[in-house]
A protein has these predicted regions:
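Short catalytic/ligand-binding loop motif for oxyanion handling, primarily in non-cytosolic enzymes
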Residues: 8-11, 52-55, 74-77, 143-148, ...
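A structural signal for short, well-ordered beta-strand segments and their strand-loop junctions
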Residues: 1, 44-47, 134-139, 165-168, ...
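GT-A fold catalytic core of metal-dependent nucleotide-sugar glycosyltransferases
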Residues: 109, 113-167
Length: 278
């Protein structure tokens, strides 16, 4: 399951004062998706009505359901609440100056879309669009180059079925108090990536309830964050539900390299990463 909505990142240009790494047009994301779309796995994709035909054409005959959705209409009130907090001086004053460029702190569209991942997966399950018991969320733009998928034709890795499988880029995540969770959010510390999550349908339903509770708590504390911070809170409240799978230090795109195939080479790669950390 994945999703793409054009939130105007093509206009986040450096000549307008934005950090250069933020600028990505809708066409850039479509190009990234072409790499992911080469997988033969069934896919459910949520997008806007105008992008639906283009995405269907890319998948070209592979088992795919593209669901058109107007997220601005459906999530209008929550988006307004996010925008209010992002403009609130009390919230802004908590952030370090260097964090102010990050879009989760100023773009309501970005914060909203990042926080809808579990909604999209559970909506796909509710609509009976998912044919397998194991379901993965993978970001639409996760595969920025063709070699990210490591030549896989079908992704079918034996993840722990009793857990929600997260993927981490830093070791040592400990969150003993909710204040520590909020501290991670405010300081934008990255442990868990938002780009991929794998679980059974049953665990996704359980996880969705937990995510919603964490999102509500975050907003009530006058804080906005993207999915990474919310997932840290989920880990704080229910660590037994979650398994942390290490990708290597800051190795955000190692998903298919370390958890792609069930062969000896992949096992040895993972062993190396666990020993030397990268």
């Amino acid at each position: 399951v994945t999703a793409f909505f054009d939130i105007g990142r093509g206009d986040w240009t450096s000549n307008k004062g934005f950090s250069p790494h933020l600028e990505r047009t809708a066409d850039t994301y479509i190009q990234y998706f072409e790499n992911l779309s080469k997988l033969d796995n069934d896919m459910v994709i949520f997008t806007s009505s105008e992008l639906k035909p283009k995405i269907e054409a890319i998948r070209n005959g592979k088992n795919t359901v593209v669901v058109a959705l107007d997220i601005n209409k459906k999530f209008q009130s929550i988006k307004k609440r996010i925008a209010r907090i992002q403009k609130d001086n009390e919230f802004i004053s908590k952030l370090e100056t260097r964090q102010l460029i990050n879009p989760e702190y100023w773009s309501p569209d970005y914060a909203l879309v990042c926080n809808l991942k579990t909604y999209f997966v559970n909506r796909a399950i509710e609509l009976n669009l998912v044919n397998d018991d194991m379901v993965a969320w993978v970001d639409f733009g996760y595969c920025r180059s063709a070699d990210v998928t490591r030549g896989l034709s079908r992704w079918d890795y034996p993840f722990d079925r009793k857990k929600v499988n997260f993927f981490t880029v830093k070791k040592g995540l400990t969150v003993k108090t909710i204040h520590q969770v909020f501290d991670h959010m405010i300081n934008n510390r990255s442990y868990i990536i938002g780009g991929a999550i794998v679980a059974t349908q049953k665990k996704w339903k359980e996880f969705y309830k937990l995510v919603c509770q964490c999102q509500i708590k975050t907003l009530r504390n006058n804080i906005v964050d993207d999915d990474q911070g919310i997932f840290i809170m989920c880990y704080h409240y229910n660590p037994k539900l979650i398994k942390l799978n290490y990708l290597g230090k800051n190795r955000w795109f190692n998903l298919f390299k370390l958890f792609g195939r069930k062969d000896l080479i992949t096992l040895l790669r993972r062993l190396k990463v666990s020993l030397i950390g990268k």
